[in-house]
Amino acid sequence: MRPLSMSGHFLLAPIPESSSDYLLPKDIKLAVLGAGRVGKSAMIVRFLTKRFIGDYEPNTGKLYSRLVYVEGDQLSLQIQDTPGGVQIQDSLPQVVDSLSKCVQWAEGFLLVYSITDYDSYLSIRPLYQHIRKVHPDSKAPVIIVGNKGDLLHARQVQTQDGIQLANELGSLFLEISTSENYEDVCDVFQHLCKEVSKMHGLSGERRRASIIPRPRSPNMQDLKRRFKQALSPKVKAPSALG
């Protein structure tokens, strides 16, 4: 087939008659929280690129944006990575304030600890409580993730510990290995995306674009009829008999 030439005749794609014909992807805003060196950045990059990168410079808070498909729905996904080492109880006020702004922005949360670091596990409950403090009236979904599940020889946190904490907080719990299993990482993010969609009542439908509807174009028969009426002599209708 020959390529289209702009110098010849071409067809215009139909313009939507109204805003209901134009669909925008859903906006999903997630935050990944947890102590330092638990693999938060590696999880995000693994999900978005399928690649595992083991060593990262200390994270200062990067925002990742990507269009992704989850169960056939296109999502405009934003994932906020957060610095590690933030302790809610004893951090500086400006640090806690920065974390609060991130929590306020996000709609769904991954709380990540490493199974090789018991202190990172202990940081999960205060983070969860801070989320509920910032979102007191919200059902914002939270998933607790035990990462580095491949390092069994260095395990400090048992699987049952993660399950028990999740049950106490009313959250889902998953133990994964970011380095060895892309599917598990993908499942975590996809499940959280679906929970956020359900929270906003957006499942199965797309958010409509806020564009001004254009007037409906008259069809050809209407144009012909109106043209004939304009050319025909005007005839005065007979008055009704009394």
From Swiss-Prot:
Highest classification ranks of the organism: Eukaryota, Metazoa, Chordata, Craniata, Vertebrata
Protein's recorded name: Ras-like protein family member 11A
Annotated family: Belongs to the small GTPase superfamily. Ras family.
Keyword Translocase included in the entry's annotation: no
Gene3D superfamilies the UniProt entry points to: P-loop containing nucleotide triphosphate hydrolases (3.40.50.300)
UniProt organism field: Homo sapiens
GO BP terms, alphabetized: positive regulation of transcription by RNA polymerase I
Reactions this protein catalyses: GTP + H2O = GDP + phosphate + H(+)
Tissue specificity as recorded in UniProt: Widely expressed. Down-regulated in prostate tumors compared to normal prostate tissue. High levels found in colon tumor and normal colon tissue followed by small intestine, liver, jejunum, ileum, bladder and aorta. Lowest levels observed in endothelial cells.
EC number(s) recorded for this UniProt protein: 3.6.5.2
Keywords: GTP-binding, Hydrolase, Nucleotide-binding, Nucleus, Transcription, Transcription regulation
UniProt-annotated binding residues for GTP: 34-41, 81-85, 147-150
Localization, UniProt: Nucleus, Nucleolus
Region (Small GTPase-like), start-end ranges: 17-241
Entry superkingdom: Eukaryota
Gene giving rise to this polypeptide: RASL11A
Role this protein plays: Regulator of rDNA transcription. Acts in cooperation UBF/UBTF and positively regulates RNA polymerase I transcription.
Principal cellular location given in the protein's record: nucleus
